[in-house]
Amino acid sequence: MEISNVQLVKPFGPLVMMAELPETVIKSCNEIVDVIKDRKDMGSRLAGQIKSESEIPHSMLEEKKVMDIFHALSRSYIEQAYLNAGQKNLWDAMDVKTQMQSIWTVHQYENEYNPQHNHSHCQISAVLYLKVPAM
């Protein structure tokens, strides 16, 4: 499975990775979201005003074969951060293993918002835009 158009940019502070995932990965993620969207709402945990949020069990990501892709992207991000800092030798000596703490869906609609915030107990946060309405 080829991940295309991967680039790291640094518009401010930290490096930001952008990548286009294969359509098969997007399809698998959408299938997971469609299955769990009616589960217990976790929206009260969010920083903003969002009506619907559902946590995704790691087993579903593993079953759909997308967990490895998320780990590969995380590892690639870390590698590029080390290389950008001129730390190739340090990177080459490391055996980096990534771990996903949690993953959830956010169904955001008109007049809902989620302000800038941080996620505790993690070093990398990511966002996937799966179903974006036409503008």
Predicted features and spans:
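Non-heme Fe(II)/2-oxoglutarate
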Residues: 1-92, 113
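A generic structural micro-feature
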Residues: 11, 95-97, 118-122
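Hydrophobic beta-strand-centered segment that forms part of the acyl-chain substrate-binding groove
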Residues: 85-110
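Catalytic core of non-heme Fe(II) oxygenases with the double-stranded beta-helix
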Residues: 102-135
